[in-house]
């Protein structure tokens, strides 16, 4: 099957081969989008959908206005409807400009889609884009589902976002443009290897292609296999989850704990996402799962984030929304530590535990695997810290010795490990440690 036949088949599968359908085509004037527009124009009149061209001038390059002028002239000659939008320099952020530009661009596409009652937005992502994205995400790390890559089709605005050129390589697009005399513009910023994607595009991918010229196909095959496996996993988790929740949606600890260990995290993650309508990373989920698997104490609370907490009682775990408290009050339950994140634990204190030295005053501290999960909580009667030489000191005595007023003592927070041992009386004193398996940096910021 030729690439053009694949293109036509994909449009047919999306039910777009009809003059009664309207599609929005995102056109930048680069070779990818100009070929996409040309392919649509080549469709037989009886099958060709109504085409609305959407173009965003980001005003990031001097060449941008020339490209916009050319596209305006081209659409007039071809009798195509053109909608143009300007992302003016005054709206450009000082940092994160690429992400902000993408957000503006897709906001425009959604608006054009609604105004023209279009069924789909078509973009010109291709096989090389797919490989570049795959390698970038592989290098950055994260959830394995991210390696499934750019989806051929997904819900978007009032219809779908479709990428019909994902099976085309960049070379195929260039060859098609040359054969069909398609005029396009080269974005000079695509040559800037200071940008991560451009380094991968110009250095990494060509080198890998010398190892195996079938790189694009092999990555696409891996992504399809991964998609199939993740779909099967999702179906299995749905079945298992139905066996371990109550009619009210609570997680039954014994039944969940009886699942094979490799399924407990996946089932817990899906349950929590359904309860909160939020997504969580595996690093965030692992301590929650460890807390849920403990049998003591029988009744316990654990803060997930600013909006949700977990409550375990009578053999079940519930996800409960946190009621807003007054600014000067602090939570009376535990707050789970998020590694490498600042966390506000009182009205005036923000703390963090970092694996690298932060840009504020910090205290190096030894941790072990057994310490996790760590939590912040108000100090309690009986809490004590380890002193140099092996002795201990009650937190209550420490605060009295430091002449902390009684009304302020209640606001003092401590960092405790999984065994309940105090590692840090925040703002006052650290427990003494000289060994461990991991060095972290404990930091505190005061706010008025």
Curated annotation (Swiss-Prot):
One of the record's GO molecular function terms: tRNA(Ile)-lysidine synthase activity
Primary subcellular site in the record, as a coarse category: cytoplasm
EC number: 6.3.4.19
Pfam families according to UniProt: ATP_bind_3, TilS_C
The protein's enzyme class: ligase
GO cellular component: cytoplasm
GO biological process entries: tRNA modification
Compartmental location: Cytoplasm
Binding site for ATP: 28-33
InterPro entries, alphabetized: Lysidine-tRNA-synth_C, Rossmann-like_a/b/a_fold, TilS/TtcA_N, tRNA_Ile_lys_synt, tRNA_Ile_lys_synt_N
Keywords from the named record: ATP-binding, Cytoplasm, Ligase, Nucleotide-binding, tRNA processing
Reactions catalysed according to its record: cytidine(34) in tRNA(Ile2) + L-lysine + ATP = lysidine(34) in tRNA(Ile2) + AMP + diphosphate + H(+)
Entry function: Ligates lysine onto the cytidine present at position 34 of the AUA codon-specific tRNA(Ile) that contains the anticodon CAU, in an ATP-dependent manner. Cytidine is converted to lysidine, thus changing the amino acid specificity of the tRNA from methionine to isoleucine.
Family: Belongs to the tRNA(Ile)-lysidine synthase family.
Free-text comment on this protein's domains from its UniProt entry: The N-terminal region contains the highly conserved SGGXDS motif, predicted to be a P-loop motif involved in ATP binding.
UniProt name for this protein: tRNA(Ile)-lysidine synthase
């Amino acid at each position: 099957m030729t690439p053009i036949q694949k293109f036509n088949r994909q449009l047919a599968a999306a039910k777009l081969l009809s003059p009664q359908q309207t599609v929005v085509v995102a056109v930048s004037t680069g070779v990818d989008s100009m070929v996409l527009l040309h392919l649509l124009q080549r469709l037989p009149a009886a099958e060709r959908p109504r085409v609305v061209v959407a173009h965003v001038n980001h005003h990031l390059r001097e060449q941008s206005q020339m490209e916009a002028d050319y596209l305006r002239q081209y659409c007039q000659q071809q009798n195509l409807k053109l909608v143009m939008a300007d992302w003016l320099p005054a709206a450009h952020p000082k940092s994160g400009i690429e992400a902000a530009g993408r957000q503006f661009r897709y906001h425009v596409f959604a608006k054009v889609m609604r105004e023209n009652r279009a069924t789909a937005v078509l973009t010109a992502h291709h096989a090389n884009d797919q490989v570049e994205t795959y390698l970038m995400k592989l290098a950055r790390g994260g959830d394995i589902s991210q390696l499934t890559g750019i989806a051929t089709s997904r819900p978007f605005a009032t219809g779908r976002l479709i990428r019909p050129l994902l099976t085309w390589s960049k070379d195929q697009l260039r060859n098609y443009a040359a054969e069909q005399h398609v005029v396009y513009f080269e974005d000079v910023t695509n040559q800037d290897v200071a940008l991560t994607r451009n380094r991968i595009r110009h250095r990494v991918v060509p080198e890998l292609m010398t190892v195996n010229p079938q790189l694009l196909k092999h990555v696409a095959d891996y992504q399809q296999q991964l998609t199939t496996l993740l779909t099967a996993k999702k179906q299995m988790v749905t079945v298992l989850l139905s066996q371990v929740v109550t009619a009210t949606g609570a997680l039954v600890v014994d039944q969940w704990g009886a699942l094979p260990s490799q399924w407990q995290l996946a089932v817990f993650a899906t349950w929590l996402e359904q309860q909160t309508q939020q997504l969580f990373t595996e690093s965030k989920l692992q301590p929650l799962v460890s807390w849920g698997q403990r049998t003591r104490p029988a009744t316990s609370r654990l803060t997930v984030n600013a909006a949700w907490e977990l409550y375990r009682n009578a053999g079940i775990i519930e996800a409960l929304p946190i009621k807003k408290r007054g600014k000067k009050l602090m939570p009376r339950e535990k707050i789970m530590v998020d590694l490498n994140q600042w966390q506000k634990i009182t009205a005036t204190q923000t703390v963090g535990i970092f694996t690298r030295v932060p840009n504020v005053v910090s205290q190096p501290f030894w941790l072990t695997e057994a310490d996790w999960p760590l939590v912040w909580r108000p100090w309690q009667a009986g809490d004590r810290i380890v002193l140099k030489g092996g002795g201990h000191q009650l937190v209550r005595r420490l605060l009295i010795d430091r002449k902390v007023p009684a009304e302020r003592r209640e606001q003092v927070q401590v960092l405790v490990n999984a065994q309940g041992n105090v590692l840090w009386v925040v703002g006052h004193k650290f427990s003494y440690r000289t060994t461990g398996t991991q060095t972290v940096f404990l930091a505190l910021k005061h706010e008025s």
